[in-house]
Amino acid sequence: MTDNTRLRIAMQKSGRLSDDSRELLARCGIKINLHTQRLIAMAENMPIDILRVRDDDIPGLVMDGVVDLGIIGENVLEEELLNRRAQGEDPRYFTLRRLDFGGCRLSLATPVDDAWDGPLSLNGKRIATSYPHLLKRYLDQKGISFKSCLLNGSVEVAPRAGLADAICDLVSTGATLEANGLREVEVIYRSKACLIQRDGEMEESKQQLIDKLLTRIQGVIQARESKYIMMHAPTQRLDEVIALLPGAERPTILPLAGDQQRVAMHMVSSETLFWETMEKLKALGASSILVLPIEKMME
């Protein structure tokens, strides 16, 4: 990590964002061995070093200029931002873009048998959480006083253990809450993974590499959100068929040998193609409908 000409990226070593971060880098063409226990891995084909750390260390590494980029959940980033501001610091960084994974929500949850009449039900209560600053900001805005119980794991067991009256924790499906006799009552923050960059002057070669990486990330995300569609469509109903499949550009229309009533149509659709859409296409006279995934895409 002493070579300042190499781009330094921090990502979660293990946990909720680890696998998706690793897949994103791989699909961007960065060849790197992340299957070892090493905390620092060097890309084989680009001047990039990957620093594998705990997720709650990543915002600080970027804000302090130790690394150039970080892949982090917005919930962890915002919590660290509020923490540093509470200590009188002025943390600086840039959010380059939101990513298409790591979606979750930070929610309040109470025992299923407790009455719930809105956030005021928590006035004067003890709330267990790993996100004290996000919780405080939300309840301060509501004018609600509470006692915070800071836990760094297993937050959902706090009410049963008598440590708290309610919890504020990340929720994906709600299954963990249900298993612990809790119900989600209020969402206070919605989060996805994001790519952030340190503040300050960046070497030109590094900035060019960051720009290239951003272009590739955009292509990866567009490819995941798009499908390549091929079909035979009736010429008299082409406009109706196209209207069902919004895309970035107009479709490619090709003649069919020996068939004057239909054409072959190829297009990239920017929306998920549901079974209902395919059934509507078939009702319009389309046939031989193929929906294919896209590995890479660049407009």
Curated annotation (Swiss-Prot):
Principal location listed in the UniProt entry: cytoplasm
Listed cofactors: Mg(2+)
InterPro entries attached to this UniProt entry: ATP-PRT_HisG_long (IPR020621), ATP_PRibTrfase_cat (IPR013820), ATP_PRibTrfase_CS (IPR018198), ATP_PRibTrfase_HisG (IPR001348), HisG_C (IPR013115), N-reg_PII-like_a/b (IPR011322), N-reg_PII/ATP_PRibTrfase_C (IPR015867)
Reactions this protein catalyses: 1-(5-phospho-beta-D-ribosyl)-ATP + diphosphate = 5-phospho-alpha-D-ribose 1-diphosphate + ATP
Keyword Manganese found: no
Top class in the EC scheme: transferase
EC number: 2.4.2.17
NCBIfam families listed in its UniProt record: hisG, HisG_C-term
Protein name (database record): ATP phosphoribosyltransferase
Organism phylogeny: Bacteria, Pseudomonadati, Pseudomonadota, Gammaproteobacteria, Enterobacterales
Gene designation: hisG
